[in-house]
Amino acid sequence: MSESEARAAQRAVEVLSAYGVSHVFGVPGAKIDSIYDALVDSGPQLVVCRHEQNAVFMAAAVGRLTGTPGAVVVTSGPGTSNTATGLLTANTEQDPVVALCGAVPRADRLKRSHQSMDATAALKAFTKYTGEVNDAGNVPEAVANALRAALTQPRGAAAVILPSDVLATPVSAGITRACPVPRLGPAPAEGIEQAARLIRDARRPVILAGVRGADPEACAALRTLLEDTDLPVVETFQAAGVVSRTLDEHYLGRVGLFRNQPGDIVISHADVLVTVGFDAVEYDPKLWNTDPSRTVVHIDVVPANIDNHYQPAIELQGDVASTVRALAGQLSGLRLDPEVLGELAEQRRALKDADDTARTANHTRAGLNPVSVLLTLRDMIDDDATVTCDVGSHYIYTARHFRAYEPRHLLFSDGQQTLGVALPWAMAACLVRPGKQVVSVSGDGGFLFSAQELETATRLGLHFTHVILRDNTYDMVRFQEELKYGRTSGVQLGDYDIAQYAGAFGAHGYRVETEEQFAKVLGEALSREARVQPGITIIDVPVDYTRNTELFAQLHEGVLE
């Protein structure tokens, strides 16, 4: 190998560095060990995980939190197939992530040999870009194009399949600088003017902020619009935090899953609905837009996904931030009718009343009130804390009651509702937001989907708190089965000693029985200097979910129409 040459594996690492990738997550193996070897000398920080699925969760969270793709490096066969759920979750929820997957040597590709599989065919269904490289000289460009695909809107997951003999081959060509994805300009001026007229002429205009509206620049532009208008905003789960604390009077709650929130009432009464970066996967339009003739203004970087219940009158396709800024210039000083402002104030009171009612609802000896626990957590954390939420009944309560004031600081799996994401996401948040409070929340079922990564977290010296709301069932399934069939099946789980489990990995584990105990342990765990409780704290909180069928309650049409 000449001085100008390097193994293709080294060239792949150089591309990751050129594109600003900060962390590589994975589990090593013989078919990908050349990249692990290259990472010894240079490149992103390597984080060795306990399972490839969790490695993808961590990388995807880095992508969501920073806007720069996270990277995963895994071996062939099961190492690659184990990434499927993580890649599917990232792709659906538009988190930029790239997986570099080892493969058997090219000569064994079509043989029935150890760990041979058609990885490209397997992963294409879960990614927006997947390709196998058969020439070592093409490795740098393949990795670069995967990174660009992950960053192109709608963002998502990409994978590159790399046979081990290709990675070991010396090549001279490399890519040492990033080629950024071109940024679009604002939507056409005439469309913006038309949209501004519709909004100005409307009696009850409403903004529905979605996942791409929570991108930092888009969020800043939306806040500029709100500062000089009376426009109300309803957030999707993925847009949590778009409305800042100083703009709280514009906030009308979050919507998703079940059509029964104050935000649903506000949306149903809107004569012009302005969607900003909204994706149908966040909240199926058939659930909330029962009158498709209602005027919808679609602001997004991608075209609308037309269906029977979502047919925008105007599509403003372009850079969301630039488009919203241009629209703000034409809506400056927009004021709503006092009667409409009164209606909105009534729904804001309903939001507060819902918090108060849920917080004080009776609970049994079986456990604590889950909403009260979550609101205690909200009261005790900083506004710049990162809270990651797993999937389960607590996920619905969190989305409805837990306020966030900065985007990408309250994280949900809203597209696939994937169990086990919260703990790996929290670990990623610790890596990219050092010194900030990080809390993850899960049920006792979801916790065990990724709990083995506690070893990874303690090995890395991370500091965060994980709250487990435990009822020993798959409760989100349980209460829906009760509503459908009047009985349950397959949802009962056994108890386990969470405190001992945590201690086995070097974490601090506690089981609390009262809200006072919870607040005390949480306060010690959140100590910014980590003097009281350094490292990782796992808090086991028994909760009473007997009122969960109320989550599914439907508002009657007289309220909604």
Where are these regions (language model features)?
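Hydrophobic, well-ordered secondary-structure segments
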Residues: 282-285, 293, 327-336, 340-355, ...
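Active-site-proximal structural scaffolding
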Residues: 226, 266-267, 370, 450, ...
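Phosphate/pyrophosphate-binding active-site segments
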Residues: 2-3, 175, 292-293, 297-395, ...
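N-terminal alpha/beta PP-like core and its mobile active-site loop of ThDP/TPP-dependent enzymes
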Residues: 2-335, 376, 380-383, 463-466, ...
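Active-site diphosphate/adenylate-binding microenvironment
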Residues: 9-12, 19, 30, 35-40, ...
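Thiamine diphosphate
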Residues: 108-115, 245, 258, 307-309, ...
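Short hydrophobic beta-strand that contains or immediately precedes a catalytic carboxylate
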Residues: 208, 388, 442
